[in-house]
Each structure stands twice: as structure tokens, then as C-alpha cells.
Amino acid sequence: MIEPLLLGIVLGLIPVTLAGLFVAAYLQYKRGNDLGME
């Protein structure tokens, strides 16, 4: 049986991790465009 606390932590971290990766990729893409790099 999975502990509810552990399950809550995992379910909480997944969207945060995905959001962090998305923001990092967006900032890198935007910075690349600002520098004129394709």
C-alpha cells in the first residue's frame, strides 16, 4: 500500500517539474530569438 503522503508528494511534484521544464525551454527559446539565433 502506497502511503498517502508519498503519493501526494509525487502528484504535487510532477506538474511542478513539467512546469519548470516548460518555463526553462520557453526562456531559452525566447533568449535565442533575442540574440538572433535560429
UniProtKB/Swiss-Prot annotation:
Give the main location. Answer: membrane
**Segments traversing the membrane:** 5-25
* Tree of life domain: Bacteria
A Pfam family matched by this chain, by name? PetG
Q: Which UniProt keywords apply?
A: Electron transport, Membrane, Photosynthesis, Thylakoid, Transmembrane, Transmembrane helix, Transport
Q: Which GO terms describe its molecular function?
A: electron transporter, transferring electrons within cytochrome b6/f complex of photosystem II activity
Give the similarity note. Belongs to the PetG family.
Assembly and interaction partners? The 4 large subunits of the cytochrome b6-f complex are cytochrome b6, subunit IV (17 kDa polypeptide, PetD), cytochrome f and the Rieske protein, while the 4 small subunits are PetG, PetL, PetM and PetN. The complex functions as a dimer.
Q: Which HAMAP family match?
A: Cytb6_f_PetG (MF_00432)
Question: What is the name of the protein in this document?
Answer: Cytochrome b6-f complex subunit 5
Annotated source species: Picosynechococcus sp. (strain ATCC 27264 / PCC 7002 / PR-6)
Q: Which gene name does the record give?
A: petG
